[in-house]
């Protein structure tokens, strides 16, 4: 039995997110699994590191799957790319140890949200950026972005589960290692770049919506700690559209730090 790690890039515009859905809805996971079924004649479950939402793109999504196929990782990669639409590509594949788990062993994820600032949106970036040509105080947005670094309760920046009890029980604490606004004047763009251990659903898009409110002057930089403390999602900015969001990549520990080691550490913590 092989355990194969793959790195995937995709344009999320035509897909209903990462996670497989029954019926005819096209998803990234479903597309990958269908290609593998045709290649191996096996019913293979692909485990993704991040469950990106509908319309969200990826430059370096990571997943893994187990197969009895005798094909090498590179042969599987070529065969999958030949069967899938050009909007999804396996850009790297390798055979890893049986203990590797793409989701649970990830140490950090990096996301990038692109905002196009030009007056006219070029057709070739349509569906890949948020278009906002109006005035923004980008310096204030940069200062506000830095407020998200460190460990915080992100209750004000997450989607509701739909259940008040479940919302109360969720662990909303997250650690953010990097949070900044990056300017790209040559392409009339700014981007929000964030790197952290893990993220809540809609968290990045809620942060971007809040930073835009700062840029418009509706929020002040000093409002960010107040919004954190309130633990009330109605006080943060709107959830921006998905098309500007990219999963840039994931980071993993040394291969010797295995899935079995991770589970042992979890048990030790109780």
Question: Which positions does each model-derived feature cover?
Answer:
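Structured-RNA-binding interfaces characteristic of tRNA pseudouridine synthases
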Residues: 1-270
């Amino acid at each position: 039995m092989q355990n194969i790690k793959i790195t995937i890039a995709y344009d999320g515009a035509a897909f209903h997110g990462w996670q497989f859905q029954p019926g005819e809805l096209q998803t990234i996971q479903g597309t990958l699994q269908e290609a593998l079924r045709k290649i191996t004649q096996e019913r293979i479950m692909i485990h993704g590191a991040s469950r990106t939402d509908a319309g969200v793109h990826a430059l370096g999504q990571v997943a893994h799957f187990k197969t009895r196929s005798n094909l090498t990782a590179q042969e599987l990669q070529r065969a999958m790319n030949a069967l899938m639409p050009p909007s999804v590509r396996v850009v790297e594949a390798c055979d890893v140890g049986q203990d590797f788990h793409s989701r649970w062993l990830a140490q950090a994820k990096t996301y990038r949200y692109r905002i196009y600032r030009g007056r006219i949106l070029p057709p070739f970036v349509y569906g890949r950026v948020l278009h906002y040509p109006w005035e923004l105080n980008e310096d204030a947005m940069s200062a506000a972005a830095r407020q998200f670094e460190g460990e915080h309760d992100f209750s004000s920046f997450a989607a509701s589960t739909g259940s008040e009890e479940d919302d109360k029980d969720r662990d909303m604490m997250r650690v953010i290692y990097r949070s900044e606004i990056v300017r790209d004047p040559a392409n009339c763009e700014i981007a929000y770049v964030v790197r952290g251990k893990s993220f809540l659903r809609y968290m990045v898009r809620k942060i971007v919506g809040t930073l835009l409110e700062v840029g418009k002057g509706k929020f002040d930089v000093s409002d960010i700690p107040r919004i954190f403390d309130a633990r009330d999602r109605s006080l943060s900015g709107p959830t921006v559209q998905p098309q500007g969001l990219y999963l840039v990549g994931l980071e993993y520990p040394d291969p010797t730090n295995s899935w079995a080691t991770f589970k042992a550490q979890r048990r030790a913590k109780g």
